[in-house]
Amino acid sequence: MKPEDLSALLSAVLTDAVDAGDLPAALREGITPARVKVERPRSREHGDWATNVALQLGKKAGMAPRDLAGLVAERLTGKPGIAAVDVAGPGFLNVTLDAASAGALAREIVEAGPEYGRNDTLAGHTVNMEFVSANPTGPLHIGHTRWAALGDAIARLLRASGADVTAEYYVNDAGNQMNVFADSVLARLHGRDVPAGGYPGAYVQELADAVALEHPDVRELTDEAARPVVREAAYRLQMQDIKDTLAAFDVHFDVFTSEQTLHDSGAIDQAVQRLREQGHIEDREGAVWLKTTDFGDDKDRVLIRANGEPTYFAADAAYYLHKRDRGFEEKVYLLGADHHGYVNRLKAIAAAAGDDPATNIEILIGQLISVNGAKLSKRAGNIIELKDLVEWLGRDALRYDLARYPADSPLTIDPELLRSATNDNPVYYVQYAHARASGAARTAQAHGVDRSEFDAALLTHATESELLAQLAEFPAVVAAAARLREPHRVTRHLEVIAGAYHSWYAACRIVPMPTDDGTPRPVETLNRTRLWLNDATAQVLANGLGLLGVSAPEKM
């Protein structure tokens, strides 16, 4: 029995009491399964699960919470799967499951396989998840590494919770930066220094060499004639490098949207016209302004300059409407720490478009990241490249560590820790638990222990109860992590599961202990049932790691 199953049972008991007239009808709205919360008590002596539902409903029921708890306990006692119900303190309910009910979860998990933990709490939600969106003028760096790991993990969690998700990369390929980029590559083609304000780094020379291979005669052209050729080729080659780097990091996008296409297709002019028709545009000082102060921004924003050129903000507005027109109910932006000023203006765009800024747009601002002892990349112009971090620390360690902390907390990566094969290294600790469970299954098979029998009532050891309880909470953790956009909830829970597994592994044998003279003892139902629990744990660990883009090794 999982916590959500117990919540549903408690809800049914309370509903029956209302129907019988023992509780007032006014309680009905507050006793849905979603509102009846259960949690693991701090002390095992207080049962398997606890709830404060009587404390929450006592006043509305016109009863002392302890009396209400007693009524619920009386009705809950004797229900299938319930071993004991105790009232504690001012009205807490402590529930102990019978071993068969708790242990049945092991078989349920094994039979569900990769589907265990997936849920439908966000079914019907259409989500556009935009992240990374680095300029195509250089390699991905350390900051992009964090947004890639977090954004991809959030997208995986949303999908696991039933949402229809599109992972999107917005390519900032318009504006003067692309001209500066092209001029930098062009300068290197001719052996010149990059222009003032240009892009340094050996990667620019590499791009120049690659462009020359594609276009052998490019050096014979004038700069004016060569510039569009160089710009197109260097942009395409750099974007391919970005895509290859992301793929090596196991981060995948469904859509790459070009900012330039918004200009070329007339989408920006159309967006301005739509906003004008809705009454949110003002012409003054020769420019076109969006009245964002009407929606909480600190000042109005220019869309079209007096010289007729659209601003970057105009592209932002057109891009938001582009997402909206594609049917996305929720637009999630994962932006860097230098984008705090974008929050109000993006929400103003949403409001001006007729959306609810509280529900239709979500802006996650990530904080800075640093790495102790990292070497700056001369190739990239004294930055730390994503591909170098992956090569140095390993994809799994890096992705896990980046997902382990809230996006809005500054993070310093400890390479020595992440490269260590010790229990102090969180990713090693979790992956080792999976490898240990996989190894235990191989050992069991070699000794004739299989899953041909299962008796959940035999899983009575205290470590088995704890392990089952943590496995039972996994689906709710996944749902909460998706709803709150917080992958770190999954990492922390996996560490709890790993700890519970290691304790169980030390206390309970799957393969029977031989006699003192080495004679093998016969395999019993308990041994086979424990193999189910072992394999269930391996499955949950693999499922959780997969949601983070981290592998689940079978050997370490």
From Swiss-Prot:
It is an enzyme of class 6 (ligase). This is Arginine--tRNA ligase. The gene is argS. One of its GO terms (cellular component) is cytoplasm. GO terms for molecular function: arginine-tRNA ligase activity; ATP binding. It catalyses: tRNA(Arg) + L-arginine + ATP = L-arginyl-tRNA(Arg) + AMP + diphosphate. PROSITE patterns: AA_TRNA_LIGASE_I. Its EC number is 6.1.1.19. Belongs to the class-I aminoacyl-tRNA synthetase family. It comes from the Bacteria. It is found in: Cytoplasm. A motif ('HIGH' region) lies at residues 134-144. Monomer. Pfam families: Arg_tRNA_synt_N (PF03485), DALR_1 (PF05746), tRNA-synt_1d (PF00750). NCBIfam families: argS. One of its GO terms (biological process) is arginyl-tRNA aminoacylation. Keywords: Aminoacyl-tRNA synthetase, ATP-binding, Cytoplasm, Ligase, Nucleotide-binding, Protein biosynthesis.
